[in-house]
Regions:
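Anaerobic metallocofactor- and corrinoid-dependent redox/one-carbon enzyme cores
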Residues: 2-180
Length: 180
């Protein structure tokens, strides 16, 4: 369920079966607070899942990231998007998540202007995920008002495949459900 971490925690506390708790994360404390949580919240979520969750292993969290989220909440402290995104992966790694994926291009041309920037960001995110050792995947997407099309997104998916991307969260196949 792609709900806020606290809503998922309440469901687990009430007996709902759950293998993974999801949360979008940012690369700064201020960014995460803008998303409505703190590191302590994630620690509590992990402890709850290890006690009451249905997963068999110790990796019970799923995080989504994406370049630009700190800029949209004015939580970047004049730091570039790539550095802030790298901080996301270091933060994620602390919690030993089962999955981490970037949703590259979702936030729009205000932060990634066109297909070239989306491609660059997707490859940067993949590289940083590999460097930090998180189980890194990608959701390749774009917004309708961005200078990109499905061919660009499929090209990115192909490049990420060649680069050894662990998984894709949704495969474009000439159509993006988020655009319909």
């Amino acid at each position: 369920v792609l709900a806020h971490v606290t809503a998922q925690m309440k469901a687990v506390e009430q007996g709902a079966p759950c293998d993974l708790i999801f949360q979008s994360i940012a690369g700064s404390q201020k960014g995460n607070e803008a998303f409505g949580f703190t590191a302590r919240t994630l620690e509590e979520a992990k402890a709850l899942m290890l006690q009451k969750g249905t997963a068999e292993g110790p990796n019970v969290l799923y995080f989504e990231t994406g370049q630009g989220s700190e800029l949209s909440s004015n939580a970047h402290f004049d730091t570039d998007q790539v550095t802030m995104e790298a901080r996301c992966y270091g933060f994620a790694r602390h919690f030993a998540p089962f999955l981490v994926n970037t949703v590259v291009g979702f936030i729009g041309p205000e932060y990634l202007y066109d297909a070239r920037q989306v491609t660059r960001a997707g490859l940067e995110d993949h590289f940083m995920g590999k460097l930090t050792g998180v189980s890194m995947g990608c959701d390749c997407c774009y917004t309708n008002h961005m200078k990109a099309d499905q061919n660009d997104i499929e090209n990115l998916a192909g490049l990420l495949t060649l680069a050894g991307c662990n998984y894709f969260m949704g495969i474009p196949h000439g159509d993006d459900i988020m655009l319909n």
